[in-house]
Every structure is written in C-alpha cells, then in structure tokens.
C-alpha cells in the first residue's frame, strides 16, 4: 500500500502519536542517549511508531523484528520489514523463533513470551535498555474486554502496563492513549506502506471477535467508549499498584515464607492479596480463585501445631512446615 516512506511534504504535526513521543523526548536527560529500539512487525501500528521515532531520533533509532514462523505470510512480513528499513536507512535486527507449546499451553501465550524473550535479546545486542511497543488505545480496550470475559481481577482489568520489565529489559508503550484508527489514517494519507496480518481476521480467536463484532457495536452506541474504557484501565492499574505496595508491606510483617500466626492476624482480603504477591515472587504460576480460596480456608483452620497444609497452587504445591 503506497510507498515505503512518506511522499511529498510531511505534516509531522498531524501525526497522531508524535505529541506523546515529543513529551518523552522533552523529558529525557542528557545521559539518556542510547539506542531507541522499536519492535517492528511491519504492521500499521509499529510502522507509525518506527517512523515517528525515526523523525525524532534519526541517528539513534533501530528496529527489532521477530519472525514467529507461525504462518506462511511470516516470510513476506520479514522481507517487507527488511525492505522498509533499507529504504529508510534504519538499522534492523531480526530473530527467528519457533514457539512449541506444551500440550496444555496456549500457542498464543507461548508465542507472546517467545517474542518478548527474542526482543529482549535483540535489544541487548543493540545496546538498548528499553524496547518500544506500538500498542494503542484500541488494543488496551480489547485487552480490558478480554480480561472481563475471563473474570479477571485488578491485574487483568488494568490492561497492558505502560512500563514493564521482562528478561532484564524494559518495555515501554508510549501510545496507550493514542487512537489506532488515526495512526492508520495518517499512514494512508502519506502513502506509507505496511502489512496487514491475515491472522487478525481469524474470528476463531476471542480477541478478533471482540475487535470485529463487539467494538463496532460499542462505537455505535457509546462513541467515546474507547477513551472511557482506557480510563477505567488506568484507574484499575492505580488500584493494583496500591495493592502491590500493601502486599509488600504485609510480606515484611509476616515473613518469607509466611508465618501462619502473623498471616492469620490479617483480614482475609489482605491474606489473599499477600499470598498472591508472595506466590508471584516465588515464581509460582497464578493460583486459580478456587485454589486461593482453599488455601485461605486451610490457613484459617490452622489452630494447632500439628495442623498440616498441602495443596496444589498453580503448577506447584503449598505446604506447612513447623510454625510457617
């Protein structure tokens, strides 16, 4: 679609995401002069982010591309990415991955984790401490709605975090408040090429059904729903951050591993909160609601030294040793 780079005079002030990046540029200290690493799939969103970053930091930007080899078009995506980066003169690093989920694991989740690991590895090779991701407001709304369908708690309702660390590398989403449709319209108006992933049309996936069936109905009934839903996600993120602070303080009180008597002195909601926090820190997979409730019942029943606890939590086990 169009040329690989903007044609004619470019009105950069009309780029929907430029203001957010400019604020980042204005807030940077003199010491922050490392590479600006952008995760670049070749799609519209990452193309818009790479182009905007290239405009602001032409000597520092680099592109990172992960080929998942999950569909026949993957090789075409990589060829497109290589051609665009060559046209723009942007350094590019590419990594090939082949996600192989275990029998009970989700291919989507395994592929996503493989992508983060690959991006972190590419960023280290490039000397970058942070990878920029092009998720926008509509992506955040889809994530929130997907979490609601799964009965998620605050961590899920908070949506995608603006900042996070994985595999020793920071990940930044500067455009969670930016309209994705406006980004695509800007690219089209300036003749910038991008690829459309055919898997995004596959409505066997829940996220795609939300995108193609639910969001248009919400848009028709509640035109400002994307802004208000994204605001709800920000409120949930703030509340979750507060719970994390409280859990860390409670963990200092009850010790690690938790002392049963000190844990019992907390209210049940605080027990649940600190147990989730401790299990995450211990590297356990997320406990189900049923598992957590069973753990709380057994903790409440511990009134003698001989009372034992042994139950499955996530993919591991929780048990009592002595007074712990």
What are these model-derived regions, one by one?
Residues 182, 209, 224, 270-273:
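Generic recognition of short, well-ordered alpha-helical interface segments
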Residues 2-216:
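Core alpha/beta nucleotide-donor-binding catalytic domains of modification enzymes
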Residues 57, 126, 222, 279-283:
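A broad structural signal for alpha-helix termini and local helix breaks/kinks
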Residues 200-207, 228-237:
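Internal, active-site/partner-interface "lid" segment
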Residues 2-8, 12-44, 66-68, 97-101, ...:
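AMP-forming adenylation/ATP pyrophosphatase catalytic core
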Residues 212-213, 217-229:
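Conserved anion/nucleotide-ligand pocket segment
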């Amino acid at each position: 679609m169009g040329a690989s780079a903007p044609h004619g005079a470019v009105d950069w002030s009309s780029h929907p995401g430029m203001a957010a990046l400019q604020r980042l540029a204005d807030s940077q200290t003199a010491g922050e002069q490392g590479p600006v690493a952008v995760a670049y799939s070749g799609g519209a969103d990452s193309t818009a982010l790479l182009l905007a970053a290239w405009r602001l930091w032409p000597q520092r930007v680099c592109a990172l591309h992960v080929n998942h080899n999950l569909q026949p078009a993957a090789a075409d995506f990589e060829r497109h990415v290589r051609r665009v980066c060559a046209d723009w003169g942007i350094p590019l690093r590419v990594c090939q991955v082949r996600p192989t989920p275990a029998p009970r694991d989700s291919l989507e989740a395994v592929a996503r984790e493989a992508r983060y690991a690959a991006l972190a590895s590419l960023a280290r090779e490039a000397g970058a401490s942070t990878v920029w991701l092009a998720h926008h407001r509509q992506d955040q709304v889809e994530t929130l709605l997907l979490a609601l369908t799964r009965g998620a708690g605050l961590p899920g309702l908070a949506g995608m975090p603006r900042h996070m660390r994985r595999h020793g590398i920071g990940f930044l989403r500067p455009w969670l408040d930016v309209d994705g449709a406006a980004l695509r319209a800007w690219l089209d108006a300036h003749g910038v090429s991008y690829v459309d992933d055919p898997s995004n049309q596959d409505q066997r996936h829940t996220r795609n059904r939300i995108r193609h069936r639910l969001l248009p109905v919400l848009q028709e009934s509640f035109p400002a729903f994307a802004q208000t839903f994204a605001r709800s996600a920000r409120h949930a993120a703030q509340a979750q951050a507060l719970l994390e602070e409280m859990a860390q303080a409670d963990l200092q009180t009850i010790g690690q591993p938790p002392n049963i008597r000190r844990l019992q002195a907390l209210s049940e909601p605080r027990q649940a909160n600190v147990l989730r926090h401790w299990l995450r820190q211990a590297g356990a997979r997320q406990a189900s609601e049923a598992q957590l409730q069973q753990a709380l019942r057994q903790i409440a029943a511990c009134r003698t030294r001989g009372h034992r606890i042994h139950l499955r939590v996530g993919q591991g086990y929780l048990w009592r040793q002595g007074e712990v």
